């Protein structure tokens, strides 16, 4: 009845979800906006009015109390024969979405991860651009290298100054920027926590916590 589509911000989750929604009756609710959250001030009442539609809930981890309501709605719908394709949940914070949904929606939800574009998805002549620009669509498809670089700089700044603080951790943006840069230099190599700790002037446990945060935000794979 529910599918969770996870992936970092700007990877294309919303675009894909809206394309899916265009193929059938659906509603889209952005829970990052005040207006979107206001629409679900009484979630069971509102969503029960759209039982015949696909409900797309974007940034669903921003409204964790919703998962309990979804469980009740899914169970009610099952009794009326609505067994598949009811809710599409989008999230860019892996740990919150997985924990909240697994606790409330066990047996009612499937998970899919959407990653940036990889080398198997681009023509051979575009592989060099993929290596230099990365696989985020806005960066890869930018009209110039300068525009692509500016997009990536803005993307990093948004994560450091807005998204990470929203999740709770109080980490100096410049410290996390340096950590992120050092991780990039270790791409494909052995992770050396002690070396990073010395370079940043922090202890190994803090390095591990920073890495866990990056993994939870789907920005680093290990």
Task: Locate predicted features.
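Short regulatory helix/loop adjacent to the ATP-binding pocket of P-loop NTPases
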Residues: 95-110, 125-126
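Walker A/P-loop
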Residues: 14
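P-loop (Walker A) phosphate-binding loop of NTP-binding proteins
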Residues: 8
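ATP-binding Walker
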Residues: 11
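Interdomain hinge/linker elements that couple catalytic modules in large macromolecular machines
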Residues: 115-222
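Hydrophobic anchor at the beta1->P-loop junction of P-loop NTPases
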Residues: 5
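Short glycine-rich substrate-engagement loop in P-loop NTPases that contacts/grips substrate
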Residues: 26-54, 64
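Structural recognition of the conserved hydrophobic beta-strand(s) that form the central parallel beta-sheet
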Residues: 56, 86-92, 113
């Amino acid at each position: 009845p529910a599918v969770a589509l996870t992936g970092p911000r700007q990877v294309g989750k919303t675009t894909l979800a809206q394309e899916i929604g265009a193929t059938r009756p659906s509603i889209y609710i952005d829970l990052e906006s005040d207006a979107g959250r206001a629409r679900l001030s009484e979630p069971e009442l509102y969503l029960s009015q759209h039982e015949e539609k696909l409900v797309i809930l974007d940034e669903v981890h921003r409204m964790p109390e919703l998962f309990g309501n979804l469980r009740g709605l899914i169970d009610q719908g099952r009794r009326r024969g609505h067994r598949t394709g009811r809710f599409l949940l989008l999230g860019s914070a892996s740990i919150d979405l997985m924990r909240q949904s697994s606790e409330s929606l066990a047996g009612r939800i499937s998970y899919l991860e959407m990653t940036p574009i990889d080398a198997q998805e681009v023509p051979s002549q575009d592989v060099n651009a993929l290596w230099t620009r990365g696989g985020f669509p806005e960066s890869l498809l930018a009209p110039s290298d300068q525009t692509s670089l500016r997009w990536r700089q803005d993307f990093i700044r948004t994560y450091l100054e807005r998204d990470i603080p929203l999740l709770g951790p109080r980490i100096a943006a410049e410290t996390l920027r340096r950590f992120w840069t050092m991780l990039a230099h270790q791409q494909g190599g052995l992770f050396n926590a002690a070396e990073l700790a010395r370079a940043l002037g922090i202890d190994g446990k803090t390095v591990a916590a920073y890495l866990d945060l990056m993994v939870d935000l789907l920005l680093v794979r290990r």
